[in-house]
């Protein structure tokens, strides 16, 4: 009953994001479609289907672009990454997993476009806390790749200074 008392007296509770693997796969596929409609997904959902034995199929196109990691430290690529995050946040979508392996850059003749993958933690209708967490995570990722000055400068160029530094 001491445990019961602690459970009952908590100020808030975070429910599991997904109740089943099927829901998790569906969520990932649907977020890929929504983010793809904004032009910043690095793959396109091809199929999403429930299968026998409780399995779920999620098929997508091959990933577009080159993974953003320490080997792609060309500072001209940092601005497109922050621009892509601003697109998500402009539609109140948080990514939730902005590590370098989930970000690719598609370099064209005239420009570069940053694209996102790995939407298992993405949220539609994200709270301000989740949006701020994205900014913090992307600051860590872009600082590790491009350096602190370039990362912060690009972040402030897309978002206002108060948003980035708060």
Question: Which residue ranges define each predicted feature?
Answer:
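Short, contiguous strand/loop micro-motifs
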Residues: 17-19, 71-72, 125
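A short, flexible beta-alpha/helix-coil linker loop
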Residues: 64-68, 122-123
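C-lobe/activation-segment region of protein kinase-like
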Residues: 108-166
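Conserved Hanks-type protein kinase catalytic core
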Residues: 61
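Conserved ATP-binding subdomain of kinase catalytic cores across diverse folds
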Residues: 1-58, 90
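Conserved hydrophobic "DFG−1" position in protein kinase catalytic cores
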Residues: 47, 105-107
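Conserved kinase catalytic-core helix
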Residues: 25-42, 66-101
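A generic structural signal for beta-strand entry/edge sites
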Residues: 54-57, 102, 111-113
């Amino acid at each position: 009953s001491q445990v019961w008392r602690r459970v009952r007296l908590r100020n808030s509770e975070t429910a599991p994001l997904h109740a089943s693997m099927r829901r998790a796969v569906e969520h990932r596929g649907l977020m890929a479609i929504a983010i793809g409609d904004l032009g910043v997904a690095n793959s396109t959902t091809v199929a999403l289907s429930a299968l026998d034995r409780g399995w779920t199929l999620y098929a997508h196109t091959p990933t577009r672009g080159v993974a953003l990691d320490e080997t792609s430290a060309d500072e001209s690529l940092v601005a497109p990454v922050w621009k892509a995050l601003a697109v998500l946040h402009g539609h109140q979508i948080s990514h939730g997993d902005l590590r370098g392996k989930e970000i690719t850059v598609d370099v064209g003749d005239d420009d570069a476009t940053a694209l996102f993958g790995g939407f298992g933690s993405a949220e539609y209708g994200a709270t301000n806390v989740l949006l701020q967490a994205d900014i913090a995570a992307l600051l860590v990722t872009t600082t590790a790749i491009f350096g602190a000055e370039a990362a912060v400068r690009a972040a402030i160029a897309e978002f206002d200074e108060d948003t980035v530094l708060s």
